[in-house]
């Protein structure tokens, strides 16, 4: 109930105010003070030279003549996807390590940018433009005319929100973290609006579209607009379950419980029948929830990665509930993955190898036949066929699947009693998992750190104010925003975040 939630929240606040700094007594080759000076130097540059009203793109020319999100952007824009909320989390990690208020202020500025850009429906798009929607529509117009092989999700202006690439999820979770840290209601309100959005956009079956509010106008040839399909790709279904769980567990939002349970049973409903007992990246809203297409290089078909992800989810749901219905058809999914795996001769033909315990599978297999589908393009269009020669390079036609680890986890669960399985359940367990969930929420992905890596970063930051990166190939086409030459290196928020993560990991190991 809410009383328990309030108790939990009080304990979380206590945890949040307890800053763990292990560097003081640890034996290290590099003084902690040197690392902290470098962290602050790199952060000040990002906040004072790079930030736009608290928000960030991905890459910038060293002279700031050009800037990019996933694609080239206007200076008035900031990126949500892998951008502003991710930077905010790095600032909070640094704040909770060092106690330096500068990092908290940087995180608050990022949060303010996200609050400014929250859609009226409660979610977020891929990017924001502080110059307004007219300016953003002009950007889309240039992208449509200027990019040949652009990221197709940016080829049409919808004016709505997206779950793709965790844009809405990352924003909502970062603002939830801000609220738990500060208890400032200015951060709770947008989290509640985000929860409203997640609940409103959920289909009765329990899944979510890629975008919401729903639009259907972007039809290409004989392919309907895919953004209304139930989406598993890029973690949409998993992320929304995680967000509902966080709201229920950390905020005591009981209205999240029934939608969460529906989302769990939706995974069962979407699984194909034998011999194709897998999942697709998108499922249509027809009677069979059949696989649906997405971008031109994402055909309708069953997908190995989606299947592995849903198997892990089902095992997680079993831990939460102790209900064996979540385990019942996992062996069918394993059988499906085994049936589409490449043998050694085929992997040699493809020039691929895998690690021990992994299998190599096609990214997509054809509905009804299990034949691998391969992805191609030329300057004018994409196509899909059965020929593994001449494949596109920006999106792989094959995927490595950790099948053995899935099987091991499944067998381990079978060996446990129901009481053992559910001991950490957020619903029926005897253990308060809020601290574990909060830790996951707080830390994010941490980089492995060693003395050599840290020393290399420190050397760079003695010469520069930033950690340089390279412009990714998808960003190199010029849709006409600038005639300035492409830089040999860029100011990269990815390199900044990786570097900060390395420093933090080193100081806390």
Regions found by a protein language model. Name each.
Residues 4, 25-45, 109, 149-156, ...:
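Terminal, non-catalytic domain-edge segments
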Residues 14-20:
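Bacterial N-terminal signal peptides
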Residues 50-242, 257-258, 271-295, 300-301, ...:
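Extended ligand-binding groove/face enriched in aromatic
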């Amino acid at each position: 109930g809410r009383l328990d939630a309030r108790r939990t929240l009080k304990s979380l606040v206590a945890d949040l105010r307890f800053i763990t700094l292990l560097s003081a007594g640890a034996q290290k080759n590099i003084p902690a003070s040197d690392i902290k000076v470098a962290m602050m130097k790199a952060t000040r540059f990002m906040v004072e030279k790079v930030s736009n009203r608290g928000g960030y793109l991905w890459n910038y020319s060293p002279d700031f003549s050009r800037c990019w999100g996933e694609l080239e952007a206007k200076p008035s824009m900031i990126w949500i996807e892998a951008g502003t909320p991710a930077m905010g989390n790095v600032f909070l990690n640094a704040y909770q390590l060092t106690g330096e208020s500068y990092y908290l202020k940087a995180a608050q500025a990022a949060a303010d940018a996200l609050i400014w850009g929250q859609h009226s429906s409660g979610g977020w798009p891929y990017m924001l433009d502080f110059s307004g929607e007219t300016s953003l529509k002009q950007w889309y117009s240039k992208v449509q005319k200027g990019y040949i092989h652009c990221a197709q999700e940016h080829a049409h202006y919808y004016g709505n929100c997206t779950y793709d690439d965790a844009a809405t999820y990352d924003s909502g979770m970062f603002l939830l973290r801000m609220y738990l840290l500060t208890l400032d209601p200015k951060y709770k309100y947008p989290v509640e609006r985000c929860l409203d959005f997640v609940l409103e956009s959920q289909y009765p079956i329990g899944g979510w579209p890629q975008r919401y509010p729903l639009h259907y106008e972007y039809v290409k040839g004989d392919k309907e607009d895919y953004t209304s399909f139930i989406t598993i790709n890029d973690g949409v279904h998993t992320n929304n379950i995680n967000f509902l769980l966080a709201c229920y567990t950390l905020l005591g939002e009981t209205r999240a419980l029934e939608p969460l349970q529906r989302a769990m049973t939706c995974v069962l409903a979407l699984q194909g029948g034998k011999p194709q007992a897998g999942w697709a990246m998108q499922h249509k809203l027809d009677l069979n929830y059949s696989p649906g297409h997405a971008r031109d290089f994402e055909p309708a078909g069953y997908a190995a990665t989606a299947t592995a992800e849903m198997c892990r989810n089902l095992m997680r749901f079993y831990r939460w509930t102790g209900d064996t219905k979540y385990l019942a058809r996992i062996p069918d999914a394993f059988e499906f993955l085994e049936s589409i795996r490449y043998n050694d001769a085929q992997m040699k033909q493809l020039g691929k190898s895998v690690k021990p315990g992994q299998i190599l599978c096609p990214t997509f297999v054809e509905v009804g036949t299990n034949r691998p589908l391969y992805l191609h393009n030329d300057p004018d269009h994409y196509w899909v066929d059965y020929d593994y020669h001449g494949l596109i390079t920006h999106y792989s036609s094959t995927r490595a699947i950790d099948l053995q680890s899935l099987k091991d986890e499944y067998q381990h669960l079978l060996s446990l009693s129901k009481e053992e399985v559910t001991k950490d359940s957020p619903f029926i367990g005897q253990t308060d998992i809020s601290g574990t969930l909060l830790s996951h929420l707080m830390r994010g992905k941490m980089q492995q750190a060693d003395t050599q890596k840290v020393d290399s970063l420190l050397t760079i930051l003695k010469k520069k104010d930033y950690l340089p990166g390279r412009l990714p190939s998808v960003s190199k086409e010029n849709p006409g925003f600038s005639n300035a030459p492409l830089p040999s290196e860029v100011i990269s928020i990815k390199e900044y975040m990786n570097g900060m993560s390395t420093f933090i990991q080193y100081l806390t190991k």
